[in-house]
Amino acid sequence: MGIRIQELCKQFEDFTALAGIDLDIRQGELLALLGPSGSGKTTLLRIIAGLEHADAGRVLFGDEDATMMSVQARRVGFVFQHYALFKHMSVYENVAFGLRVRRGKARWPESQISARVFELLSLVQLDGLEQRYPMQLSGGQRQRVALARALAIEPRVLLLDEPFGALDAQVRRDLRRWLREIHDRTGLTTVFVTHDQEEALELADRVAILNQGRIEQVASPAEVYNRPSSPFVYSFVGAVNRLPGCVGADGLEVAGIVLSCPPQLSGWGAVDLYVRPEDLVLDAQEGWLAIVLWSQRSGPRMRVRARLEHSAHEVEIELSSATDEYVEGQKLRLIPRHYGVFFSESGG
């Protein structure tokens, strides 16, 4: 089931959490809401769940207006960062909880509940642990129980609020791959909040980048990384070098060299050029002359910090499959093979 967000606004006293959000979440996709603290990503997720209500705008589940629906009526599965498991209940009882609290005709017979619980424990790879209690499980196992509990009620939508934030790095990496497999098997429309770029880019079909209550860009992980739509996205997702320049009669000039001007850039004025470290390449003849400040090898990759000659501007370069060593004071020529250009605040 798809979700449509239309002109959603939310204010907390003097703080604007959401400022007119429009977003279409496709049926069956895994969408990441990525942004810094205070960007509005968790507020948006909670409004989709029905845990918060917007001041203005609408939330549609398919063609159904869910804006004023209760949490129960929306039938969403929700997984929190800190598990929210019942400590006094076994794994089995935690997963069965949402099914047992149903009333009337919606209540399943115990045999059906039991079958569903064991089906889910198998899905999340916790077979044989149904009688354990949360305190007897690792952090990764607890999060799997939380996901099984969310799936037990057969939700129309699955929502996850920084589900791996409390876990160590290796467990997070393992669970990311596992969650992607679970999503592909269930086909549920899934929205998850994260501030971890790597997590969003590895897991999601699409990423929505939020900043100060607004969406900066919605695109595939590759497009968000390779073709950011704004200076904020360039700066927030991945490492980037920023260099001032200008667009004039002679074209785009940055730090003393003329570069090809992107066709979408119309007008003249001061600009900022954004180029990722891996997109600065060595060139024997053309480009900026730079002086090495330091270098650091990490396996086959080499990271080099250099200062552009006759300039105070420093850049970071990442060279893959590098065989040469680079020493302080060594001179290099650099050319950007791929970059973004935006008018600066003073020039646009």
Swiss-Prot record:
A Pfam family per the record: ABC_tran
**Protein name in UniProt:** Sulfate/thiosulfate import ATP-binding protein CysA
In terms of SMART domains, this protein maps to: AAA
Give the stretches traversing the membrane. none
Q: What is its main location?
A: membrane
SUPFAM superfamilies referenced in this protein's UniProt entry, alphabetically: MOP-like, P-loop containing nucleoside triphosphate hydrolases
Q: How does it sit in the membrane?
A: Peripheral membrane protein
User: Which lineage?
Assistant: Bacteria, Pseudomonadati, Pseudomonadota, Gammaproteobacteria, Lysobacterales
Keywords recorded for this protein, A-Z: ATP-binding, Cell inner membrane, Cell membrane, Membrane, Nucleotide-binding, Sulfate transport, Translocase, Transport
Quaternary structure, per UniProt, is:
The complex is composed of two ATP-binding proteins (CysA), two transmembrane proteins (CysT and CysW) and a solute-binding protein (CysP).
List, for all copies, the residue spans of the domain called ABC transporter: 3-237
Q: Which PANTHER family match?
A: SPERMIDINE/PUTRESCINE IMPORT ATP-BINDING PROTEIN POTA, SPERMIDINE_PUTRESCINE IMPORT ATP-BINDING PROTEIN POTA
Name the source organism. Xylella fastidiosa (strain 9a5c)
The catalytic activity, as recorded, is: sulfate(out) + ATP + H2O = sulfate(in) + ADP + phosphate + H(+); thiosulfate(out) + ATP + H2O = thiosulfate(in) + ADP + phosphate + H(+)
A GO CC annotation given for this chain: ATP-binding cassette (ABC) transporter complex
